[in-house]
Structure formats: C-alpha cells, structure tokens
C-alpha cells in the first residue's frame, strides 16, 4: 500500500459547541489535498481520538471516505489499549471503506513485547486492510522494540508500515535494514523527517503538513532526487514551525495555526485547552516568517 511521502495526521474540526463539524471537515480535506497531502489519517492523536466517541470515529471514517472519493488513501486510527475494542472498531472502519488502519501501541497497561506482538497480530488477523503500526512511547510509555516490529513485518502479511515516533534513529535504522523493501517506515516526528529519510525512511505522518505540506513535499522530493543541500535548506526553514506546533499540547497549536491561515476548524476538547495569548502571538510570529 502506497501512502505517499506526506501523510497528514488530520485534526478533527469542531463547532462552537464542541461537536464534530462535518462542513468544516469537508473544507479541510479539500485544503489538505491541494497542499501536499498524499494520504489522511483520521481519528489519530492529532484528531483528538481520546476524546472522540466510537460513534464519532465511525462517522468520521464514513464521511472522510465519501468526501475523499478515492483521491488519496484514508487511514483510520483504530488502535487502543483494549484489543477486543480495537478489533471491533477496525471492522467498522473496514465497513466504512477506509484503505488502511493505524494501530497505536497499547497505552497505560504497559504490555510486554510479547503482549504487543499478540495484540497487533490479533487485530491484523481480523481485517484484510493494510496495517500501519504506530510507536509513540512519549505518549504510551510502552515502546515497540525494533525486534518486535521486524517480527511483525515478517510474520503478518498485512502489517505493511510503521509510524515511528520514538526518536531513536539507531532503532529506526535497524527496522529499515531488517524488514522487507515493501515495509515502509514513516517518521512520526516532523522535525526528524529528513534524518529518517537519510537512513532509508519513506516519508512522514505529519502535523506540520496542515501548514507547510507543499514545502514538506518539496523537501522529500529534493532529498530523493539527490538534492540534499536543498532539502536541508527547506528543513532548516521549516524547523521553527515544526517546533512551535508542539510547544503546547497537540493539536491546540495546529488548530490555531489553521485559524491564523483563515481556516476555521474550531477549538479543542477538554482536557486540552486553547493557546494562551502569548502562545498564540508566538505561533503567529513564526508562521508569518514562513
């Protein structure tokens, strides 16, 4: 499954009462697809999945599939720390017509490597969809060891990719070196996109692509075409906004950044809160320099 170079971890728009706003979602999807997005992740971390109900997630999957209409792959965030619930949601996502699912490592209950292997194996066995693993130990505590990722890629045909947000380039290099060529490793950290490309990564599952998708595409294309100095210049240009988007809990900064760009996507749900005025001014200043 080709997810492209830049997959956007899409925010979930809300109205002024905090309900999912599908009209805003339609506008957002069109905007992203015109600005460098090769595929969309729906109801992931940036989509505020912890505060979305199961019914809301299914509605988001269905609506996004309909709105995208085959233009790019749609990847549904169906992972959780409850294997049975993840299987149920994955089946609903498949019924909705998504192209793949993303499964985060189980959080809070701190499973062993064998527990994580069996968790992912059980979910993958219940779907024909391609599976992208998601390793983000900064959020989940549990980190998927490279050996476990390699084992999953070898043993389970529909485990086809991983979003790696561990920040461990040595581990990421090992995964790339010891998995099949058609197993794709994506950076889960915008700021590490270029370093991960340099060790053989495929691209990025991005937050910054909401704001700088075209530039990120150009950076990756320059790198793959051997124009590494030009790629480095774009990386240096984008690094301040990549950092600014994570100075406050994600996705409050990126939602504010979209609003500053004239795209109303609403606020965040509690326990997240909007940016302070100082945070907003800092973000606005950084965006204006892009």
UniProtKB/Swiss-Prot annotation:
Cited InterPro entries: Aldolase_TIM, DapA, DapA-like, Schiff_base-form_aldolases_AS, Schiff_base-form_aldolases_CS
Gene3D superfamilies: Aldolase class I
Site (Part of a proton relay during catalysis): 45, 108
Pathway info: Amino-acid biosynthesis; L-lysine biosynthesis via DAP pathway; (S)-tetrahydrodipicolinate from L-aspartate: step 3/4
Active site: 134, 163
Subcellular location: Cytoplasm
Positions contributing to pyruvate binding: 46, 205
One Pfam family in the UniProt entry: DHDPS
Annotated family: Belongs to the DapA family.
Subunit text: Homotetramer; dimer of dimers.
Molecular function terms from GO: 4-hydroxy-tetrahydrodipicolinate synthase activity
One GO CC term, this protein: cytosol
Enzyme class: lyase
Annotated organism of origin: Bacillus subtilis (strain 168)
SMART domains named in the record: DHDPS (SM01130)
HAMAP family named in the record: DapA
Name of the protein this chain belongs to: 4-hydroxy-tetrahydrodipicolinate synthase
Catalytic reaction annotation: L-aspartate 4-semialdehyde + pyruvate = (2S,4S)-4-hydroxy-2,3,4,5-tetrahydrodipicolinate + H2O + H(+)
GO terms classed as biological process: diaminopimelate biosynthetic process; lysine biosynthetic process via diaminopimelate
PANTHER family: 4-HYDROXY-2-OXOGLUTARATE ALDOLASE, MITOCHONDRIAL, DIHYDRODIPICOLINATE SYNTHASE
